[in-house]
Amino acid sequence: MFKAIVSADTLGAALDSVSVLVDECKVRLDEEGLTIRAVDPANVGMVDLELSASAFESYETDGGVIGVNLDRLEDIVGMADSGQLVHLDLDEETRKLHISLDGLEYTLALIDPDSIRQEPDLPDLDLSSEIVIEGADIDRAVTAADMVSDHIALGVDPDAEEFYVDAEGDTDDVHLELDREDLIDLTPGEARSLFSLDYLKDMNKAIPKDAEVTMELGEEFPVKMHFDFAEGDGHVTYMLAPRIQSD
C-alpha cells in the first residue's frame, strides 16, 4: 500500500536528481519515506536519494519496492504548476500508480523491480578534502569548463587553502580558484582528480543554485557531492568516478 500527497516542486526535484543518470529505477518505500539508489549504465555516476515522509503533505505505506519509468513520471508531474499538489495511489493488484493533479487523472504502468538493474553499494571512501560550496559556483565552473573541454579537473591546494577547477582544451584553457572566503567552508587536503564533464553537467542540472553543496575530493578518487532540497526533507548524494589519467 502506498498513498501520498506531495507538492509538484518537491516530487519534480527528487525525480530530476535521479533522471539525469538513469531512465528507470527502483523506489523503496518505508514508513520513514522513500529512497532511490541507482548507477548509470557505464558505472561512472551514482545517485542516492532520500525523501523523508515529512516532505509530503500526507504519506502512508506498508513498505515495498516499485519500479518506475522516470521519463514518463517526470512528464506527468511536469504538467503541474509550481506549488500544485500531486496525489499518488498505488494499485497493488494491477501494479499501476494512479496520479491525479488539478483534475487530471493518469494511470502509470509500473516496471517489475526485478527487471531493473540491481542497486549499487555506496562505497565508504576516506577522502582528504571537503569543500562546502554554493550550487551557483559549481554551475559557473561547469559552464566555463564546458567552453573549452570535455573533461574537468577538481582539486584542492592545501598550502594556498584553495579549491580550484582546471579544464584544458586543444587550444584554450580555463582555470578557476575559490579561496576560503569564496567558499562556505573548506577542510583542505591534497586532492586532484579528473572527471568527465558530461556527467558533471548532468548532475549540475539537478543541483539548486542556492544549495549548499558538500563536495568530498581525493587524489584520483571519486568525487562525492551532497545537498539538501525540499527545505531539508530531501537529501541527494552524487558520486562520480574519475577518469584515469594516462602518462
Curated annotation (Swiss-Prot):
Gene3D superfamilies on file: 3.70.10.10
Keywords: DNA replication, DNA-binding
Keyword DNA-binding on entry: yes
One BP annotation, GO: leading strand elongation
Any GO molecular function: DNA binding
Top-level taxon of the source organism: Archaea
Alphabetized SUPFAM superfamilies for the sequence: DNA clamp
InterPro entries listed in its UniProt record: DNA_clamp_sf (IPR046938), Pr_cel_nuc_antig (IPR000730), Pr_cel_nuc_antig_C (IPR022649), Pr_cel_nuc_antig_CS (IPR022659), Pr_cel_nuc_antig_N (IPR022648)
Assembly behavior: Homotrimer. The subunits circularize to form a toroid; DNA passes through its center. Replication factor C (RFC) is required to load the toroid on the DNA.
Function recorded in the entry: Sliding clamp subunit that acts as a moving platform for DNA processing. Responsible for tethering the catalytic subunit of DNA polymerase and other proteins to DNA during high-speed replication.
Similarity comment text for this entry: Belongs to the PCNA family.
Protein name: DNA polymerase sliding clamp
Phylogenetic classification of the source organism: Archaea, Methanobacteriati, Methanobacteriota, Stenosarchaea group, Halobacteria
Gene expressing this chain: pcn
